[in-house]
Amino acid sequence: MSPSTPTDPCPCGRAAGYAQCCGQYHAGAAAPDAETLMRARYSAYVRRNVDYLLASWHPSTRPAELALDEGGRTTWLGLNVQRAIATGADTAEVVFLARYRIGGGSAVRMTEHSRFVREDGHWYYLDAR
């Protein structure tokens, strides 16, 4: 995981610094809604925080392990949340566009439609299409 200072900008794109934004969720606070969890997960990918990614993944769909780009070849370039909707009292969907580059290659755009579920007051990533 990358070191940071409290004033570093948050990778998720919100105006708050990392410590006041996604950093608090990476430290164990519960995300208040699915969009915030999705933003915190994006920031975890940027910072290569595998522990948070696995902890925020619903146990029914969580992989046993997650291998990220340990060589640091992937550079995350930005996040654009296109839609976040509650689909039930404890379910939600978030559609977002993330941009990244691998090595010196061209930037890639990835659109994802993610599903989330809340259990015992905590939101979890369920799956995506």
From Swiss-Prot:
Belongs to the UPF0225 family. Pfam families: SEC-C, YchJ_M-like. PANTHER family: ADENYLATE CYCLASE-ASSOCIATED CAP C-TERMINAL DOMAIN-CONTAINING PROTEIN (PTHR33747:SF1), UPF0225 PROTEIN SCO1677 (PTHR33747). This is UPF0225 protein XCC4159. InterPro entries: NTF2-like_dom_sf (IPR032710), SEC_C_motif (IPR004027), UPF0225 (IPR023006), YchJ-like_M (IPR048469). SUPFAM superfamilies: NTF2-like (SSF54427). It comes from Xanthomonas campestris pv. campestris (strain ATCC 33913 / DSM 3586 / NCPPB 528 / LMG 568 / P 25).
